[in-house]
């Protein structure tokens, strides 16, 4: 486990007189492991917070503005990533602002970290039935037979990198359910994966 690996590295540092280069390498492993554990705990906290959310917490959310901000923030977080927003009329739904933003952020992070994407496209289409939010990427994609399983907690696709908590898409699925909708992975016209979030119109 990550904690076991961290303990082993710390014991090596405590008991062996390593050359500077090896010492830096072990310290780097410790820092990377700590970062992974911290990300897992943070994701678990967000899952717990989501389970405590109620309909009373839902407010009007401008999806067009939310996607625009997510695009700009993602390009700051991931240098070299191109994120575009498909122009559309203002789209407002009733929902959880933080939860919807978390969904988009996690979809982008998943595309970059596990799919190696260099381009992401965000879009939202509104109708009487509700709204469809799509996050498309040009990454390596997710095999069709794994697209349902990767939404489960701690699940990892065969194309996923070794880093990560295995909770990113579980959080997406949770938020979709909290909004009475669904989340699914599809083929993207960009060549990678499309995360499609379908949210129903208010009753």
Name the predicted role of every residue range.
Residues 137:
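Acidic ATP/Mg2+-coordinating residue in the GHKL
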Residues 119-129:
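Short beta-strand/loop element within the Bergerat-fold HATPase_c
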Residues 59, 80-92, 190:
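Conserved catalytic submotifs in the C-terminal HATPase_c
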Residues 142-155:
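Short conserved segment of the HATPase_c
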Residues 14-21:
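Short acidic helix/loop segment immediately C-terminal to the autophosphorylated histidine
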Residues 180-186:
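Glycine-rich ATP-binding loops of the HATPase_c
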Residues 111-115:
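Short helix-loop "hinge" at the ATP-lid/N-box region of the Bergerat-fold HATPase_c
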């Amino acid at each position: 486990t990550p904690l076991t690996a961290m303990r082993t590295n710390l014991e090596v540092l405590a008991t062996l007189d390593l050359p500077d280069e090896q010492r830096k390498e072990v310290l780097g492993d410790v820092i990377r492991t700590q970062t992974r554990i911290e990300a897992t705990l943070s994701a678990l906290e967000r899952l717990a917070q989501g389970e405590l959310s109620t309909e009373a917490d839902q407010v009007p959310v401008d999806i067009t503005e939310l996607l625009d901000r997510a695009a700009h923030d993602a390009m700051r977080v991931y240098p070299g990533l191109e994120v575009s927003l498909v122009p559309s009329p203002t789209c407002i739904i009733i929902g959880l602002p933080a939860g919807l933003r978390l969904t988009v952020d996690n979809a982008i992070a998943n595309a970059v970290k596990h799919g190696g994407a260099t381009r992401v496209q965000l879009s939202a289409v509104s109708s009487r039935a509700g709204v469809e939010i799509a996050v498309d990427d040009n990454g390596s994609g997710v095999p069709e037979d794994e697209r349902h399983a990767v939404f489960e907690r701690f699940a990892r696709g065969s194309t996923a990198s070794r880093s990560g908590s295995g909770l990113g898409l579980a959080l997406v699925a949770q938020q979709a359910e909290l909004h009475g909708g669904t989340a699914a992975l599809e083929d993207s016209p960009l060549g990678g994966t499309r995360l499609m979030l379908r949210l129903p119109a208010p009753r």
